[in-house]
C-alpha cells in the first residue's frame, strides 16, 4: 500500500522538450566562455605587441629649395647626378646625427629617391634601437638650423617640409619563429612545445632580432603551466628558463635543453638550412624574395673540426642594393665582424677559425634579384708554407691576408676605378684589364686622416733571407704614406719599406729583403689624408734569397704644382707710420697655401703701438696670425688669432710689435687687412694718484680699501696679495708679513693664536698650520699686531715695535697633493706599453677639443688645484680663442667608458699661454687652463704637487709618464686605456748632444732610454713627467716635443716646471 508521502518523493520522468532546453543552455554557456577567452587573449596579444614593438628604421622626406636644381637624371639611380647628390646628402645626414643626442643609436642613412618640386628627397634612417619619430625629426631640424654639415653652406632646406614616419617594414606582426624574421599578416599568438610549430610576434629590424616571445604555455602532468618572460627574451622549449631573444639561433647553446639552437626552429627561409657541418657544403639565397617575404634575415652557422679554417666561395652575388651580407669569425655574442658586402661580389672569403656566422639581411621587396649561391670548404693554415701565405693577386679574394681590426678603415677589393673620387687604377696590375682585381684604400672621399692595415699570417723562421715583391699605386694630390713593417715578439714594428707622396696614375714595383730571426708578420699600412686619394696593392709574392737589383726604374713623385702665389712674402717688412696699413698676400682675394710672412711694426722711442684688424677671415685653426710684443726674438706673446673675425685690438708695451702670418696646405680664405697707430700710453690706463691702488684692470680704488677683506676691484686684485712670508718666498715657513697701504708689515707674536695661524696658512694657499713660535726681533719694522674678530676675520693694527721685540715664526703644512689613493706598480712603457690601473694617476687629465661637432682627445694635462690645469702651450695654440671648445675629463681610465661614475667632465673657460712661449723655438711650452666649475677630490681625482722654485732633479733618476697618446709610431689614433711608464732623467748636456737640431734650454728637462722603445708620443703632449719624493708625486715636467716616438738616442723633451712656479702660483692664489 502506498502513502501520499511515498508519491511525493518519487521520480518524475524528463520530457524531450526539457532535454532540448538544457542542451541549448549548456551550449550558450560554452559559447560565452569561449568569447570571453578569445577577447582576453586578443587584449593580451595587443598589449604584448605594443610592449614588444621596436622601430629601427624610419623613412623621411624634405625639400631642397636652393643650392641644387632638379633634372630628369635624378630619377635614374644609376646616373652620376643621382649618385653625387645622394652621396652628399647622406654625408650631411650622417654628420647631423653623429653629432646629435642620438649618436649612440644612429647607424646610417640611405637616400633612395628624388622627386620634382624644387628637389624633394626621400630617405631611410637606420638606428640600433627604437627611437621616436618626433625625436628623430627634432634632431634633424636642430642639426640643419645649426649648420652642422658643410653641405648646408650651399643647400637650403625647407624646415617645414621635413617629415619623419615609421617605415612599413617596422610594423609589428605575427610571424613564424625562424631565423628568417619576415613580415606577414597578423595572426593569434600561439606557442607549442613542438618547436617546429612555435610562433610568436616579432618586428623585422636592421639588427635582426630573431623573435620576441614573452609568454609560452607547456603541457605538464598536472595540467598547463604558463611561463612569462620579460620583453626582449623568450622561453626555452622544455625548461623553466627565459633567454634573450638575440641569443636564439646564434650558434651557442643557452637553453638547458638546447632548444634555442634547434635546427627546425632556426632553419632559414632562404634555403631551409641553419647549421652547416662537415668539410664542405652549400648555402644560398636564391630568387628572393617571394611577395610575402620582404624583411627577411637569414642566418647560417658553419662549424667544422677544431684546427681547421673555413673558405667560402660566392659563385654569384646579385642582391638588391639594400640587402647586406655579413660574415663573422666565431659565433654567439663574441663573434667578430670580418666583412660586410652589398652590391660588390665577395669572391672568396677565408676565415681563420672553425666557426663562422653568416647573416643575410633582405630588406627589399623586389623579385628581380637573383641573390647568391655560396659553397664552403675547409683548409688547414698550419700546413701552408710562407710562399702560400704571402702570394696573392687578389683574384681569389684576399688570399691569406687579413684586415687589421685595430685600424681606422678597411681595404676594398675592386676591379676598376670607382665613384665618387676616380683616383684609383683604371685596371688591376695582373691582367691590365677589367677582369682582374686589386685592393684599395676606401674609394669614397676621406673626411679625416686614417690608417688602413693589412696583415699576413705568421711566417715561419727561414734559414736564409727572402724577398718580398709587390706592386703599389699611390695617387693623387691628397695621398700620404705607404709603409711595410715587420711585427714579431722580438721586434717593435720595424719599418722596412716606406713611400710618401703622389706617384701618379701608375703601378710601381716594390721589393724588400726580409731576414728575421724568428716568426714574424708582414703588415702593409696605408695612411691617407682628408680628401680624395688612393693607395692600392696587387701581385704580392715571396721568393727565396736576397732581392736582386730591381728590373724597373725607381718611380718618381709627381711634381707638386707651384703655388698660385709665392709662399714667401719677401719680408720681414719694417713698417713705420704713415706707412701703417698692411694685409695678407693677395688680399682681398685668397691667400696662398704654406705662406709665411712677418711684419715688424715700429714707433718712436717712448711710444707704444695699437694694432687694429679692419678685416679678418682665416681658415680656423690651420691658418694663424701671431702677434708679439717687441722684436721677433725678444718678445712676449700678445695673441694668436685664427678663424673668422672680428678680433680685438692689441696694444704693445714697447715701441715694437711683430706680426707673423702662417698658413697650411688646405683651405684658403680672404685673409686680413690691418693698420697700426702709435702714441703714448695707448691702451694703458692712466696712473692712479699716490693715495690710490691700481687694479689689474686699470681702475683705481682708495689705498685704504687695499687688503680689507672685501674686493673693491672687479678683478679682485686688491685682495690677491695681502699676506706672505718674509721677502715673498714661496716656502711654507718664515716670518709673516701683511700688506697695509702698500707697505709690508712684519707680524708680532703678541696675542697670536692657533686660529690665527690656520687663517694665515689658508690665506697663503697652504694647508693647516703645523707650528708657530715667537722669536726675538733682529731688525726694524714696520710691524703689525694681529687679533681675530668674533667672525674669524683678522684685525691688523700697525705698530712701531712689538711687545718684547717678539715676532712670530710660522710653519704651514703643504696642501694634500701627489698622493695616490689606488696604488699600482709602474709597468714598462707608453709607446707599446702597459695599461695603468684605474685611479693610478688621479691628477692626469684628458683634454678633448670639439672641432666640426666632434670631440677628439688631443692632449693631456695635470690637475694642480680644484680648478686649474697645467698643460703644454702648443696644445692650445690656435685653439685658444674659444676655450669652451675644450673639455677636461678627470678621473678617466678608459676612453670607451666616459660615463664611468668616477669620471667628471668640466668645460674650460679660460686659457693662458705663457707669454714667453715661442712656437718656432719650442721654448716655454706651458699653459694654464681654468675649469668652469671646481672639482671635488675623490680616490680618482687628486691634485699633483708642484716642486719648489728652481728645485733640482738629478739626471739618472727614474720618473714616470702617463697618457692616452699613440702606443705605436704612426698608429693613427690614441689608445683606449691610460698607459704608464718609467723613464730616466738625462742631463741637458747629453740631451743637446742627442738632439743637435734643437736648442735645449734651462727651461727644458729631458728623459728617455738610449735604446729607445719607451717614450711619450702624439696625444701625450701636455701630460705630466712625475717624480716621487717622500711618498708624494711632483709635477717635474710637461710633455713638450721629441723626434717621432721612442727612437734610440732621441729622448723626450719636457717643460721644466720648477722654472715656472712663480707664474703658476700667480693663478692659484
From Swiss-Prot:
One of its GO terms (biological process) is proteolysis. Residues 723-816 form the SRCR domain. It is an enzyme of class 3 (hydrolase). GO terms for molecular function: serine-type endopeptidase activity. One of its GO terms (cellular component) is membrane. The active site is at 874 (charge relay system), 925 (charge relay system), 1021 (charge relay system). InterPro entries: ConA-like_dom_sf (IPR013320), CUB_dom (IPR000859), LDL_receptor-like_sf (IPR036055), LDLR_class-A_CS (IPR023415), LDrepeatLR_classA_rpt (IPR002172), MAM_dom (IPR000998), Pept_S1A_enterop (IPR011163), Peptidase_S1_PA (IPR009003). Residues 54-169 form the SEA domain. Residues 1-18 are cytoplasmic. Its EC number is 3.4.21.9. It is found in: Membrane. It holds the Pfam family MAM. Disulfide bonds join 229-242, 236-255, 249-266, 270-298, 569-597, 688-700, 695-713, 707-722, 802-812, 817-945, 859-875, 959-1027, 991-1006, 1017-1045. The chains are derived from a single precursor that is cleaved by a trypsin-like protease. Its main location: membrane. Residues 227-268, 686-724 form the LDL-receptor class A domain. SUPFAM superfamilies: Concanavalin A-like lectins/glucanases, LDL receptor-like module, SEA domain, Spermadhesin, CUB domain, SRCR-like, Trypsin-like serine proteases. The chain crosses the membrane at residues 19-47. Keywords: Disulfide bond, Glycoprotein, Hydrolase, Membrane, Protease, Repeat, Serine protease, Signal-anchor, Transmembrane, Transmembrane helix, Zymogen. PROSITE patterns: CUB (PS01180), LDLRA_1 (PS01209), LDLRA_2 (PS50068), MAM_1 (PS00740), MAM_2 (PS50060), SEA (PS50024), SRCR_1 (PS00420), SRCR_2 (PS50287). Residues 48-1069 are extracellular. It catalyses: Activation of trypsinogen by selective cleavage of 6-Lys-|-Ile-7 bond. Belongs to the peptidase S1 family. Responsible for initiating activation of pancreatic proteolytic proenzymes (trypsin, chymotrypsin and carboxypeptidase A). It catalyzes the conversion of trypsinogen to trypsin which in turn activates other proenzymes including chymotrypsinogen, procarboxypeptidases, and proelastases. Heterodimer of a catalytic (light) chain and a multidomain (heavy) chain linked by a disulfide bond. This is Enteropeptidase.
